[in-house]
């Protein structure tokens, strides 16, 4: 049916009658701006919904797989090296602390000195849940730069102490907290720049600590014997200053929550009228993912004896092999094979689909526990070197695939807090293990029982991790089943709507015929 000319004319007359009397609006006249009273609450909500759809739910950008990301990788590599190289070489500082602050009548000196290193390592991981919140709110760059500055202050203040007790705060708390704030953003930022090569890049980055673990024991051994403990700590401050500069390379691709809020406030015309509810700081919904909850429980369970060799191995060699002068070569062996393991197993992880990467961590915990229990059985120094080579290889395997597994379990958006929670849980066993080993040494006169006990938890934790692929696959089957059921319901609903509409058409046709 073609519309007649009379219908537009009638519509025009109705429009003119509805308008109030007054001058006709010209084309040059400015359009009226609606005030607060001219806009209803329903329209406000509609505008906010549309703005949220257009700005709030954008997909994260695709990782560029290179470019500036290579510089970010090098900066993250320096971060891992400077933070964990110093921590892994604490055995050298441990011996120097015994000589500098130890007294002949103090029978618990090994216990006290072990607390400094274990507290430092534990605080690095304990602060990670808090660091994850800072990373989400302020971004990787600001968090890393702040952490490096705090670490510099803590390490510098540690060089001016005259007894071991102040080191609990300056080295064990301040320096460690700064390292934690600098370390975790280096893991998170890599997932923004890489996806296909994430396993390899994580292997390269975490290999930084292996390189530093090779070099720092020799450097610290020479420095402590020539300039003393205090000046050695001041020289280590240079590493923190370089880390401070490296943090500026973490250019964000995914905006932080503060940046998202500022964008929303700029783009929303009615942002001042209605405020969104405050965002939850800690994302505890992660633990509803059963596979992640098991992972976050199994790894800390395996790490009760993990840090014991790094703290007490040097003193064990000093007591057991008194004629050996190059004790630092053991840390060099751990560092070399740890770097190889990070690169090798990081690349292997890229070929393992999904959460099956967890099996590599199970394998690594088995060999870490076995080598720890075999340390007291070594009667020659060469056998101890062989054990350290094996331990370093599988230590690199465990560390390099931690971030890729987190991305597989919870996705890139929640990976920051997932890693933060895990590292926070890891702080408890890593803090407790070395002091207990030092206490056993002070009471029994040797480290034999301490190393035997340190090898048991990795077997238990590895057994728990074996459940993760089964749990994850079961969850995926349930999701696919529910998705299939929803699709079937939609298909049936569409068919019923088609049938009802067709029956209505037939009814109208029959009525018209009648």
UniProtKB/Swiss-Prot annotation:
The modification Phosphoserine is found at residues 262, 497, 500, 502-503. Belongs to the major facilitator superfamily. Monocarboxylate porter (TC 2.A.1.13) family. It catalyses: L-tryptophan(in) = L-tryptophan(out); L-tyrosine(in) = L-tyrosine(out); L-phenylalanine(in) = L-phenylalanine(out); 3,3',5-triiodo-L-thyronine(out) = 3,3',5-triiodo-L-thyronine(in). This is Monocarboxylate transporter 10. Residues 1-65, 135-143, 192-199, 249-290, 350, 417-418, 472-514 are cytoplasmic. It is a multi-pass membrane protein. GO terms for cellular component: basolateral plasma membrane; cell junction; intracellular membrane-bounded organelle; plasma membrane. GO terms for biological process: aromatic amino acid transport; thyroid hormone generation; thyroid hormone transport; thyroid-stimulating hormone secretion. The gene is Slc16a10. It comes from Rattus norvegicus. Strongly expressed in intestine, placenta and liver. In small intestine is detected in the basolateral membrane (at protein level). PROSITE patterns: MFS. Not N-glycosylated.
């Amino acid at each position: 049916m073609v519309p007649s000319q009379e219908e537009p004319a009638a519509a025009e007359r109705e429009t003119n009658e509805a308008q109030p009397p007054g001058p006709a609006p010209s084309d040059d006249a400015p359009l009226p701006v609606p005030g607060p009273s001219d806009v209803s609450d329903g329209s406000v909500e509609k505008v906010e919904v549309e703005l949220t759809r257009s700005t709030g739910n954008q997909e994260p950008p695709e990782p560029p797989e290179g470019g500036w990301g290579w510089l970010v990788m090098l900066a993250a590599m320096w971060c891992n090296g400077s933070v964990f190289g110093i921590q892994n070489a604490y055995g050298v500082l441990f011996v120097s602390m015994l000589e500098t602050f130890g007294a002949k009548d103090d029978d618990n000196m090994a216990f006290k000195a072990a607390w400094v290193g274990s507290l430092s390592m534990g605080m690095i991981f304990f602060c990670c849940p808090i660091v994850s919140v800072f990373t989400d709110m302020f971004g990787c760059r600001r968090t890393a730069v702040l952490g490096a500055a705090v670490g510099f202050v803590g390490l510098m203040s540690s060089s001016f102490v005259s007894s071991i007790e102040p080191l609990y705060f300056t080295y064990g708390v301040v320096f460690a907290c700064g390292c934690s704030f600098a370390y975790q953003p280096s893991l998170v930022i890599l997932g923004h720049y890489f996806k296909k090569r994430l396993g390899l890049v994580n292997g390269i980055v975490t290999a930084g600590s292996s390189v530093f673990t090779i070099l720092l024991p020799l450097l610290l051994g020479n420095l402590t014997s020539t300039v003393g403990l205090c000046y050695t700590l001041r020289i280590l401050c240079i590493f923190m200053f370089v880390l401070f500069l490296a943090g500026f390379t973490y250019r964000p691709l995914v905006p932080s929550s503060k940046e998202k809020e500022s964008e929303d406030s700029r783009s929303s015309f009615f942002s001042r009228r209605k405020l969104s509810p405050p965002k939850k700081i800690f994302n505890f919904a992660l633990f509803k993912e059963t596979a992640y909850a098991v992972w976050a429980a199994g790894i800390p369970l395996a790490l009760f004896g993990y840090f014991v060799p790094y703290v007490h191995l040097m003193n064990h060699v000093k007591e057991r092999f008194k004629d050996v002068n190059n004790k630092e070569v053991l840390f060099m062996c751990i560092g070399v094979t740890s770097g190889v393991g990070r690169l090798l197993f990081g690349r292997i992880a890229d070929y393992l689909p999904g959460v099956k990467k967890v099996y590599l961590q199970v394998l690594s915990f088995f060999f870490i526990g076995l080598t720890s229990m075999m340390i007291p059985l070594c009667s020659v120094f060469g056998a101890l070197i062989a054990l350290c080579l094996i331990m370093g290889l599988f230590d690199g395997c465990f560390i390099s695939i931690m971030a890729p597994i987190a991305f597989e379990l919870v996705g890139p958006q929640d990976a920051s807090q997932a890693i933060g929670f895990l590292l926070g849980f890891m702080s408890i066993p890593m803090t407790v293990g070395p002091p207990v080993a030092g206490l056993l040494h002070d009471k029994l006169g040797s480290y034999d029982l301490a190393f035997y006990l340190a090898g048991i938890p990795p077997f238990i934790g590895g057994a728990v991790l074996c459940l993760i692929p089964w749990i994850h696959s079961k969850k995926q089957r349930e999701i696919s089943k529910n998705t299939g059921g929803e699709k079937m319901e939609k298909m049936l609903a569409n068919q019923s709507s088609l049938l009802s509409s067709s029956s209505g058409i037939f009814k109208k046709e029959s009525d018209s015929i009648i």
